[in-house]
UniProtKB/Swiss-Prot annotation:
Lineage summary: Bacteria, Pseudomonadati, Pseudomonadota, Gammaproteobacteria, Alteromonadales
Subunit structure: Homodimer.
rRNA processing recorded as keyword: yes
Compartments reported by the entry: Cytoplasm
Chemical reaction(s) catalysed: Endonucleolytic cleavage to 5'-phosphomonoester
Positions with a binding annotation for Mg(2+): 42, 115, 118
Organism: Shewanella woodyi (strain ATCC 51908 / MS32)
Pfam families: dsrm, Ribonucleas_3_3
Protein name, as recorded: Ribonuclease 3
Enzyme class of the recorded protein, top EC level: hydrolase
PROSITE patterns cross-referenced by the UniProt entry: DS_RBD, RNASE_3_1, RNASE_3_2
C-alpha cells in the first residue's frame, strides 16, 4: 500500500482535491481494517452514481426505451465496470485492508476495488456537492458514455427468452446441478434446458447469475446454427 504522503498523487489521478482528506482515507478503508470502514460511503456513492449515469443516459438517448436505458445503466454501473475504473486509478495501492485480506490479495479483488470506487464517489459528494461530483464522474465515464449504445445491451438470458417467444416455444429452464467451494468463493454449475436442443447446455461461474448467462449464451449459439 502507498504511504499516506502519496495520497495527493491519488487525488491528482482522480482529478479531485479533497478539502477534507479524512473522507478519502475513510473511503479507502475496508471493513477488514477498521471498525470505521467505507461501507456507508459505498452505499451513498452507489445511489449518487446511479443518479448521474441515469441522467446522462436519459439526455444522451432521447429515443431509447426504459428497458434500453436500464440495460445501459446496468452495464455502466456494474461491479466489473467500477473495478475497471478502480484499476485504472491503481486504487489497490492505496486501500487499507486487514491482515487477512492483504494475505489473500484483497488489493486486487474486483469487488473490493469496485466498492472503493463507489465509496470515493460518496466521499467526493460529502466533500463538495452533487454538481461537482457529477462533473468528476462524467469525466471518468467520458469514453464509456461515448461508446455505449442501446443495441447489444440485452444479456444472453433476455435474448434467449425473446428468441424462443418469437418462435412461440416454451421458455428455457435453469437448474443448479452443483455448488462447490466456501461461501466467499463458490462455483456454480447450471444446466439450461431448451426444447429446441437435445441436451442441456452447461454454464459454470462464480455466481448463479453468471452461470445462467453463460449457459444461455451457449444455447443461443446452438439454436442459431
Amino acid at each position: 500500500m502507498e504511504p499516506i504522503k502519496n495520497i495527493p498523487r491519488l487525488c491528482r489521478t482522480l482529478g479531485y482535491d479533497f478539502s477534507e482528506l479524512a473522507l478519502l482515507d475513510h473511503a479507502l478503508t475496508h471493513r477488514s481494517a477498521a471498525s470505521k470502514h467505507n461501507e456507508r460511503l459505498e452505499f451513498l456513492g452507489d445511489s449518487i452514481l446511479s443518479i448521474i449515469i441515469s441522467d446522462a443516459l436519459y439526455h444522451q438517448f432521447p429515443k431509447a426505451t426504459e428497458g434500453d436505458l436500464s440495460r445501459m445503466r446496468a452495464t455502466l454501473v456494474c461491479g466489473k465496470m467500477l473495478a475497471e475504473i478502480g484499476f485504472e486509478f491503481k486504487l489497490g495501492d492505496y486501500l487499507k485492508l486487514g491482515p487477512g485480506e492483504l494475505k489473500s490479495g484483497g488489493f486486487r479483488r474486483e469487488s473490493i476495488i469496485a466498492d472503493a470506487v463507489e465509496a470515493i464517489i460518496g466521499a467526493v459528494y460529502l466533500d463538495s456537492d452533487l454538481e461537482v461530483t457529477r462533473s468528476l464522474v462524467l469525466g471518468w465515464y467520458k469514453t464509456r458514455l461515448e461508446t455505449i449504445q442501446p443495441i447489444n445491451q440485452k444479456d444472453p438470458k433476455t435474448l434467449l427468452q425473446e428468441l424462443l417467444q418469437g418462435y412461440k416455444k416454451p421458455l428455457p429452464v435453469y437448474k443448479v446441478t452443483d455448488i462447490r467451494g466456501e461461501a466467499h468463493a463458490q462455483t456454480f454449475t447450471i444446466e439450461c434446458y431448451v426444447e429446441e436442443l437435445r441436451k442441456p447446455v452447461v454454464g459454470v461461474a462464480s455466481s448463479r447469475r453468471k452461470a445462467e448467462q453463460l449457459a444461455a449464451a451457449q444455447a443461443l449459439e446452438l439454436i442459431k446454427r
